[in-house]
């Protein structure tokens, strides 16, 4: 399947296109796209593939969709088998213990999805389609066949965006990087003798491991299923080999002959018994049971599975069955023998081996971190494995029912129990480490999440055990996994991102495209190569100069060979050439302009921080982009794209109607102010007008973080790079107040608050406006149902939904019984359990959803009514918020200055933001400075003087780049962007402003004036436009102070953390500091009445209220806990006063305490189970 590698063929007849001038607009392939002027010098022969294909293609294989079958037919696969079909074929037939009955499954198919995506999100449903299979029951005694269509449960379906909706939340299944099944040879040095030792592992997809090794005494041994080692000849004899046959095959090897001599087993029977004793110690061995055990371990499909990929890897490594289709996935005798021969030859230092079929294969050890030996389990395979688990559980049930039910009455329906299958699927989507809550901070974060590769998860590595080698960048990652984008913490190197052009082949190996080179001529024929195929070839880089006919200009070309070796070779030796300079990086990394000038550590932070940018009220595309913005935004799926060409018939904020050329009318609904998974605001707005013509694939509405269909994560701000009075020391940032007043960096955040009314033992809870002991002022914004009105401004402690819960009843007095008789249930005691705005939050109510059992809404058991309230908060930029550029340059806002105090340019324009110069040199992210210069050039526009011919520095620029209007948007693709000389030339050629002045000199610096004194600064300052993003680390979410709050149940100390409305811990080291200052009374106060002296803290409150002196502290609760723990160890501990008298710790203080607290209106019953709403 891997042999037919040519998957795309882009031959172009016009020779001038081969190198010539590239198209100057980086967005030219998408209709209606903004005209972004590109500095790219190279033409890319291949469009960026669909960025979600890794998810959608895999799921289509699983369900066996029509589109997948067509693409499989194009690949030359005559009989494609989908993932579900594969599981059913493996499972069928299920036979009973006597073999008289069998049940087989076939033809999986789906009905329509029960509800659309929006309804599933709204009503907490799973976006799923009913799965049906054809089940056939055969009675082998009578030949009777009963066939039925059986329902196998709801099967979660993938949305168009590559996500799943599970119980109303959007989730992503992350692809898993695992070691491929196959045969792996390893080399180690013995510590005592310094001899080279060799070993080999045969690793299956499912089943027992088989390991061979050569030890320091030069004997070849085998370990079966990780049990004790024994001579390898024992296994060969057990497989039926005689001494003569072993001599004939391995006569060339002294170590094999030596092993045979030391082997005491006489023949096959004795060898089998010997193996049985090692595998099943303590059980009486017989020849038959030993034979069955060995066969079941390696040669039976039910117990041992190499999988197609493992079979392919074994065949390739050992040179077996070359060119033949893969049929079996178990081990064969020839595999075992060839593996032993390969190991022996490797140990003896040979470099090649002739396989039984006559194929010569190289003899070498394997690199386990090589991408030829690591494969991807994509979403389809992960779900398939889970279904396989569920089906095997169901198989046991079917077998049992076959033996217990009456043969005449049996039908497929009565045998099958679908519960294990449904449970397995549910468990995977709900709790698996690889099924993750989708990152919806902005469109880029969602797109990156779907393209993520994780080495963690079931069957993968654990972050504690993973060493440096597996985390490191490997030469085989080139074009497959991005070397830049990975997390910074303990998961570094274990989680990666798929490169832009990479794709996954049917075996799960990642392929990357290359242009074929024939006799030194580069063609536009594209070959996709896996990592081990690439090792056999010589590859030139994308920017190797070629002429109009595609020939290399230089006689010697810089290339890379196996294991990342780089050297110059004659052009005739080159086999392939990269398709694009950005081939090696991921989508987020490809959106960093001037990446080639940034240190890799800072580029990593830049790629990661783009995913943390929050959508702003008004998005603005970058002046300096990379040409990746449009494709990333479209493939992320948050913009609206026209399906067909036509004319816009009607436009409003809520929908767009298009009259297509074929006469059909299509209405696209806009998503308005919806809440994303991360509380950001997802809003779509049209960018077309009525009567406008649109083409298929054109963006007609922007989503969050997009402008005109391009990704727009931040704002273009006028930046000055200079120290300013020490206020921007250590990465602090100074902002202009203009950004606050004009809502430049303002974002909207939406919180969802939910409450349900349940049936309790004491009666049903009720959502009502009639709440006990609450004033009318508090209820002013509630409607007659007790639910807050839309548009109400709310702050912490305000009631959103009124709810009362029945209290536990005591024995009623006669008067109460009389009241109950007169007023019925109304006089029952209830307590206020209303939904209130959590501490520290405020905003405007923008939406309410009410679900009720009376309206036939699906609700969990015991819930009668469910209310959701959406509160939106407009957050202006403020001190303490985190801002970042795209080059890993991040900082916290230290000061917001009035615009008139900011440094200003000679024409009076104040800068928006001041960054410190010290943040650049040691971090080596010079890309931010180049971006600042090019940003100024793009904003000002330029005109290159060509009166005396085109200057030398502009020789490679396309003609339309010789001049540009102000406010142009430009792209400088990674590794193929604007050069330093071009930047210097363009800075000297910028257009003057309306006063005829050129404000920034050719070195990119301007004369700045102090906004407070009006005096010029003593030195020129770098000024330009930089793209700045507001990150999700907002000060409003972090700042916190505790008043009266909950206490821990056991220690009675205040809880910690903002979510629990906790206090700040005064820890051991802080106590030392107090001791060092001799602040004894302060320390005593901190450890007693401010913490867990339960009596003291109430008395202190009372003293403060009455204006009296603070009383003496009591005994802390944690001291009493310590005593109890010591007493539980049978130690009699007494507390003595200074004069030696025993102090009695009274237990009965609680009642006095409660009484005193009640008089003061303090509630002491709050403990860790208390919810934050009860604290107001």
From Swiss-Prot:
Enzyme class: transferase
Pfam families: RNA_pol_Rpb2_1 (PF04563), RNA_pol_Rpb2_2 (PF04561), RNA_pol_Rpb2_3 (PF04565), RNA_pol_Rpb2_45 (PF10385), RNA_pol_Rpb2_6 (PF00562), RNA_pol_Rpb2_7 (PF04560)
GO terms assigned for molecular function: DNA binding; DNA-directed RNA polymerase activity; ribonucleoside binding
Keywords: DNA-directed RNA polymerase, Nucleotidyltransferase, Transcription, Transferase
PANTHER family membership: DNA-DIRECTED RNA POLYMERASE I SUBUNIT 2 (PTHR20856)
Subunit and interaction comment: The RNAP catalytic core consists of 2 alpha, 1 beta, 1 beta' and 1 omega subunit. When a sigma factor is associated with the core the holoenzyme is formed, which can initiate transcription.
Name this protein carries in UniProt: DNA-directed RNA polymerase subunit beta
Organism listed in the record: Mycobacterium ulcerans (strain Agy99)
The organism's taxonomic lineage, starting at the top: Bacteria, Bacillati, Actinomycetota, Actinomycetes, Mycobacteriales
Gene: rpoB
């Amino acid at each position: 399947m891997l042999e037919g590698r040519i998957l795309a063929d882009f031959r172009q007849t016009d020779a001038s296109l081969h190198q010539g001038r590239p198209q100057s607009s980086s967005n030219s392939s998408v209709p209606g796209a903004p005209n972004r002027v590109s500095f790219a010098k190279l033409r890319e022969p291949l469009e960026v593939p669909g960025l979600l294909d890794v998810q959608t293609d895999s799921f289509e294989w699983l369900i066996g969709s029509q589109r997948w079958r067509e693409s499989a037919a194009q690949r030359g696969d005559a009989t494609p088998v989908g993932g579900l079909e594969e599981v059913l074929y493996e499972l069928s037939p299920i036979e009973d213990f006597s073999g008289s009955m069998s049940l087989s499954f076939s033809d999986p198919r789906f009905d329509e999805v029960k509800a659309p995506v929006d309804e599933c999100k709204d009503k907490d449903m799973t976006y799923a389609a009913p799965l049906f299979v054809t089940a056939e029951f055969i009675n082998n005694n009578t030949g009777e066949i009963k066939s039925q269509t059986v329902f196998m449960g709801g099967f979660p379906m993938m949305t168009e965006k590559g996500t799943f909706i599970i119980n109303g939340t959007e989730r992503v299944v992350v692809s898993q990087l695992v070691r491929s099944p196959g045969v792996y040879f390893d080399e180690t040095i013995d510590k005592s003798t310094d001899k080279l030792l060799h070993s080999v592992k045969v690793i299956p997809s499912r089943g027992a491991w088989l390991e061979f090794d050569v030890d320091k005494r030069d004997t070849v041994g085998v370990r079966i299923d990780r049990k004790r080692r024994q001579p390898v000849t024992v296994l060969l004899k057990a497989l039926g080999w005689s001494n003569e046959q072993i001599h004939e095959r391995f006569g060339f090897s002294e170590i094999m002959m030596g092993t045979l001599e030391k082997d005491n087993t006489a023949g096959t029977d004795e060898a089998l018994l010997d193996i049985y004793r090692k595998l099943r110690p303590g059980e009486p061995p017989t020849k038959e049971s030993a034979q069955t055990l060995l066969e079941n371990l390696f040669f039976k499909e039910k117990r041992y599975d190499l999988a197609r990929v493992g079979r392919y890897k074994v065949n390739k490594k050992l040179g077996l069955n070359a060119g033949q289709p893969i049929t079996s996935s178990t081990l064969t005798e020839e595999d075992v023998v060839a593996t032993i021969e390969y190991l022996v030859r490797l140990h003896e230092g040979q470099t090649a081996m002739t396989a039984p079929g006559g194929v010569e294969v190289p003899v070498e050890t394997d690199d386990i971190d090589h991408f030829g030996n690591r494969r991807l389990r994509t979403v389809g395979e992960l779900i398939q494995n889970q279904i396989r688990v569920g089906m095997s559980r169901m198989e046991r049930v079917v077998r049992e029912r076959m033996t217990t039910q009456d043969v005449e009455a049996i039908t497929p329906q009565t045998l099958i129990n679908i519960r294990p299958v449904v449970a397995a699927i549910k468990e995977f989507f709900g709790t698996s480490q690889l099924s993750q809550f989708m990152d919806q901070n902005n469109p880029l974060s969602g797109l990156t999440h779907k393209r993520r590769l994780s080495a963690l998860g079931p069957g993968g590595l654990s972050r504690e055990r993973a060493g440096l080698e597996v985390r490191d960048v490997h030469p085989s990652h080139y074009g497959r996994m991005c070397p830049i984008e990975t997390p910074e913490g303990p998961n570094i190197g274990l989680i990666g991102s798929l490169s832009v052009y990479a794709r996954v082949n049917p075996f799960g190996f990642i392929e990357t495209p290359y242009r074929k080179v024939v006799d030194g001529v580069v063609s536009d024929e594209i070959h996709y190569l896996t990592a081990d195929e690439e090792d056999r070839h010589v590859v030139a880089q994308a920017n190797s100069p070629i002429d109009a006919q595609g020939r290399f200009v230089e006689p010697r070309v810089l290339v890379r060979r196996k294991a990342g070796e780089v050297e110059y070779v004659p052009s005739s030796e080159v086999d392939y050439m990269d398709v694009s300079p950005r081939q090696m990086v991921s989508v987020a990394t490809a959106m960093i302009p001037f990446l080639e000038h940034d240190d890799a550590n800072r580029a990593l932070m830049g790629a990661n921080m783009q995913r943390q940018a929050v959508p702003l009220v008004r998005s603005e595309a970058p002046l300096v982009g990379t040409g990746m913005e449009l494709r990333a935004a479209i493939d992320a799926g948050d913009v609206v794209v026209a399906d067909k060409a036509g004319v816009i018939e009607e436009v409003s904020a809520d929908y767009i109607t298009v009259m297509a050329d074929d006469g059909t009318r299509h209405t696209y609904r806009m998503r308005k102010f919806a809440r994303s998974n991360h509380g950001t605001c997802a809003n779509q707005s049209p960018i077309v007008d009525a009567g406008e013509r649109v083409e298929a694939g054109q963006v007609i509405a922007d989503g969050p973080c997009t402008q005109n269909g391009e990704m727009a994560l931040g704002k273009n701000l006028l930046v000055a790079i200079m120290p300013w009075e020490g206020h921007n020391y250590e990465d602090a940032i100074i902002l202009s107040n203009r950004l606050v007043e004009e809502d430049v960096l303002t974002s909207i955040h939406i919180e969802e608050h939910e409450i349900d009314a349940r049936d309790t033992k004491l009666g049903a809870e009720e959502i009502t406006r009639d709440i006990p002991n609450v004033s009318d002022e508090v209820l002013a914004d509630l409607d007659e149902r007790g639910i807050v009105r839309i548009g109400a401004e709310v702050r912490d402690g305000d009631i959103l939904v009124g709810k009362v819960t029945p209290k536990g009843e005591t024995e009623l007095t006669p008067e109460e019984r009389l009241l109950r008789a007169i007023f019925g249930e109304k006089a029952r005691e209830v307590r206020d359990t209303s939904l209130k705005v959590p501490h520290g939050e405020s905003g405007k109510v923008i939406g309410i959803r009410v679900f009720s059992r009376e309206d036939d809404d699906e609700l969990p058991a015991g819930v009668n009514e469910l209310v959701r309230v959406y509160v939106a908060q407009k957050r202006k930029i403020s001190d303490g918020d985190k801002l970042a550029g795209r080059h890993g340059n991040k900082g916290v806002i230290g000061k917001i200055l009035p615009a008139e105090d900011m440094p200003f340019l000679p024409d009076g324009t104040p800068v928006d933001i001041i960054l410190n110069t010290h943040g650049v040199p040691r971090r080596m992210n010079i890309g931010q400075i180049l971006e600042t210069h090019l940003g100024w050039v793009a904003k000002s526009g330029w005109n290159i003087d060509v009166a005396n011919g085109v200057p030398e520095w502009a020789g490679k620029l396309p003609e339309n780049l010789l001049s540009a209007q102000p406010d142009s948007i430009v792209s400088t693709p990674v590794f193929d962007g604007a050069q330093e000389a071009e930047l210097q030339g363009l800075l000297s050629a910028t257009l003057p402003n309306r006063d005829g002045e050129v404000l920034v000199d050719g070195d990119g610096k301007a004369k700045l004036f102090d906004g407070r004194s009006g005096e010029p600064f003593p030195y020129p300052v770098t000024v330009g436009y930089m793209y700045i993003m507001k990150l999700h680390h907002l000060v409003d979410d972090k700042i916190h102070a505790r008043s009266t709050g909950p206490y821990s149940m056991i220690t009675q100390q205040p809880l910690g953390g903002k979510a629990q409305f906790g206090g700040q811990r005064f820890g051991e080291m802080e106590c030392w500091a107090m001791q060092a200052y001799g602040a004894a009374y302060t320390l005593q106060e901190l450890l007693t009445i401010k913490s867990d002296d339960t009596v003291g803290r109430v008395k202190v409150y009372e003293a403060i209220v009455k204006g009296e002196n603070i009383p003496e502290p009591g005994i802390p609760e944690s001291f009493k806990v310590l005593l109890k723990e010591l007493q539980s160890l049978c130690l009699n501990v007494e507390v003595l006063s200074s004069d030696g008298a025993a102090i009695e710790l009274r237990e009965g203080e609680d009642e006095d305490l409660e009484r005193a607290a009640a008089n003061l209106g303090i509630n002491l019953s709050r403990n860790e189970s208390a919810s934050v709403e009860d604290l107001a």
